[in-house]
Amino acid sequence: MFCAASASEDCTVKVWQIPDSGVTRTMTECVVDLVFHQRRVGIVLWHPSAQNVLLSAGSDNNVCIWNVGTGECLLTFGLPELVLSACWNWDGSEVLFTCKDKKIRRVDPRDGNVEEEAVAHEGSKGAQAVYLKNGLVFTTGFTKHSERQYSLRAPGDDAFKNNLYFYQKHLLSRSLGRPDRDGGAGHQQRGHVPHLRP
């Protein structure tokens, strides 16, 4: 069996136990009901290396890190604007957030402190971010003129400091490039195959 988490309009996070044989009927009973948020929950994200640890982000601009095994909220912290995307790094020691204020934030999930922040993309439509396996950060968003755009950033990986295409330590604000794509109106989805090296 394995567990799946769902975000909900009713301000809760629900954890479901999925049998090895798969879902064969409509599931109506969750195994854990996590209650903290005051507005709808839009993001749930399992920790990449710690068992039973789940992150949730709601429309109340709050983030909660849960121990799903006990149903306990381990840590809560607020962000200044609505969270549009969240992504753990590979060992779970950092979380990236993109917010409605156009900023990308690198947060320490042990204390909720914002370690670094920068403008992700200048457009008013939302941006998304993902950690790549090599430690770089890939973002998608829009220009001021609503042209789709992507960016590659180096948020503090000393292994790349001698490479011409990468910038020095702790500079999320320095993009490695922001090629404009086109004028399409739809959001770009982050597509990343984690087990392949970029």
What do the predicted segments below correspond to?
Residues 1-42, 50, 54:
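Eukaryotic helix-linker segments that join adjacent hydrophobic helices
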Residues 33-198:
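WD40 beta-propeller repeat blades
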